[in-house]
Amino acid sequence: MPQSKPQNKAKKESRPDWRHYNLTTAGLVDDYLYSMLPKRDSVLAEMEDYASQHKIPIVGPAVARVLQQLALTIEAKTVFEMGSAIGYSTVWWAHAVGEKGRVIYTDGDPKNADRARRYFERAGVADRIILHSGDALEVLSEQKEQFDVIFNDVDKEDYPRVLRLIPSRLRKGGLFITDNVLWSGRVAQKNSKDARTRAILEFNRLLYDSKDFYTTILPIRDGLAVAIKI
C-alpha cells in the first residue's frame, strides 16, 4: 500500500518581540490567550509591530484588555499613566474613558512622546490625552487632583517611591495598577541582589501591607497588581 505523502503543516506565527519581555504566563497558556484575542484596529496593530521591531516593551493586547475592562468597571474618567512609551496602553485607556474623559501620558523620552502623539491623532483620541515628556514621578507629584486610575509602569527601581505618591492622588474606590510585579518569576528569588528585583519585592510587600489599599496580583503575562483604594 503506497504511503501517503507528508502534508506541509502551516507555519506557526512567531511571537512578536514584545511578547517575550518578562513573560511569566506559561508559553502554551500565553499562546492560547493570544489566539483568543479579537483583531485589533490598524493603529494598534501598527504600534504592536513597531514595538516588536524596535524592542520597545508594551503591555500587549491581553493585558491592555484587562486594563480597559477595569477602567470600564469603575466608570473611570481620569487616568494618570506613568511610563507610557509609544502610547500603546494610553490608546486603550483613552477608549475606556470616552470622549469626555482624560488620560495623562508621561514618558522621559521626547522621541517616544512625538511618536505617541502621531498615533493618538490617527486613533482619533488625541483630544482626550495630555502629553508630558519628562519624569513621571515629578509630573505626578505636581498633580493636585485625585484620579480614578493610576497606572504604574516606570523604571522598576522607582516602584517603592511611586507608592508613596499614590494615596493622596487617587480617589476612594479608584484603582492603582502596576505592571511587571512578578518580574519573570524572579520575585521568587528572595535573596536576589538585583536592584530591580529587590525594588519590586519591596513594592509588593509595601502594597499588600498598606492600609490604604486592597490588593490582588493577577498572574497574567508578567504580573499585574490591582489595588483598590479603601
Segments (PLM) and residue ranges:
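Short glycine/proline- and acidic residue-enriched helix-loop micro-motifs
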Residues: 50-54, 187-190
